[in-house]
Amino acid sequence: MYPFIRMAKELFVNRSAQNLSVGDIHESFHICWPWDLDFWFELNNGRALTLYDLGRIPFSGKSGFSRVIFKNRWSMTMAGANVRYRKRIRAFDRIKMQTRTVCWDNRFLYIEQCMWNSKNECAGHIVYRAAFVGKDGIIDPQRIFDEIELKHQSPKMPNWLRGWVDSEKKRPWPPMQE
């Protein structure tokens, strides 16, 4: 089940938080509860993706994305993700989550998030390719930033991210049709 109560807590805690600019990091703090575990008594991979929502959605509010989305009746959807799991997170571990905008192109906003365990080790990292969507399809992220009144151009896409973006262009769709 989706952690609605935890999300409500994050939205409440961040309701009057300082606005973020491009590249600023949103930090949030969480606990891995027993219902977040898999059969090996560590954070379930699928649940980790859900927990990343707890950082990403308040981040969207602090970045001004949510205001523009609601005003225009648009939505923000995850169009792709690349995940790394490196350290185990177990029951009752405290997690520090960090979220930031990396860059954008004419179709997607690239957001990265990481989870840090109580030993200050990076336990996981995810990069999202997010699309803003209106009734006519995908909206250029630059339009969002213009409406937020942030006169930013996208930072240069890092090489490590460029590799993933380029590989997605070569990936067959629909899959498993060869």
Indicate where each model-derived feature is located.
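Short amphipathic
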Residues: 23-33
